[in-house]
């Protein structure tokens, strides 16, 4: 299934859990000046727990949207590019977004750039835990104005 924004901004990929998370998390992007491009080619069901899909996609989307919203320079493009697909027995998720260019790293781990850090910065930690659970891989990178996260999860998890 391919990601298409239908009536009222609802995303249809064919997977109801992912559709719900993305439709909610990516609602009203146009009104916030954020351009969205996405391609989601997945089956209706995956061998990944729904709660893990919610945590994974929820954190990825929230981080991308919040990073775009921190851009305040007039005329600066705000965007999110999301690609989700399956190759062999793996789910691949790649998300890239514009951001201010400000990065905080401590012991080679990305930290939040939010002012109130008490309840922030656990999103990437939660993503890493899910990646470990599904014998996957996880990478984070950035250039001057683009922040990218790539996730690969095994769909053979729990199968004997």
Question: Model-found features: residue ranges?
Answer:
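Conserved short strand/loop->alpha-helix "switch" segment adjacent to the catalytic nucleotide/phosphoryl-transfer site
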Residues: 10, 36-57
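A short, flexible helix-to-loop-to-beta junction within the catalytic ATP-binding CA
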Residues: 65-76
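Glycine-rich/acidic phosphate-handling loop/turn and adjacent ATP-lid/helix
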Residues: 89-121
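Short beta-strand/loop element within the Bergerat-fold HATPase_c
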Residues: 74-89
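Short beta-to-alpha transition helix within the HATPase_c
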Residues: 2, 14-31
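Glycine-rich nucleotide-binding loop
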Residues: 101, 143-150, 156
């Amino acid at each position: 299934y391919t990601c298409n924004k239908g009536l009222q901004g609802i995303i249809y990929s064919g997977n109801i859990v992912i559709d719900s998370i993305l439709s909610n998390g990516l609602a009203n992007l146009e009104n916030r000046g954020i351009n969205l491009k996405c391609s989601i080619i997945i089956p209706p069901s995956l061998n990944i727990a729904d709660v893990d899909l919610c945590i994974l996609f929820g954190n990825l989307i929230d981080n991308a949207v919040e990073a775009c919203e921190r851009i305040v320079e007039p005329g600066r493009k705000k965007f999110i590019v999301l690609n989700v697909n399956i190759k062999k027995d793996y789910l691949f998720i790649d998300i890239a977004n514009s951001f201010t260019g400000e990065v905080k790293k401590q012991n080679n781990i990305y930290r939040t750039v939010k002012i109130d850090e008490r309840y922030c910065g656990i999103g990437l930690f939660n993503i890493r835990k899910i990646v470990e659970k599904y014998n996957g891989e996880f990478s984070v990178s950035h250039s001057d104005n683009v922040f990218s996260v790539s996730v690969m999860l095994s769909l053979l998890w729990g199968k004997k």
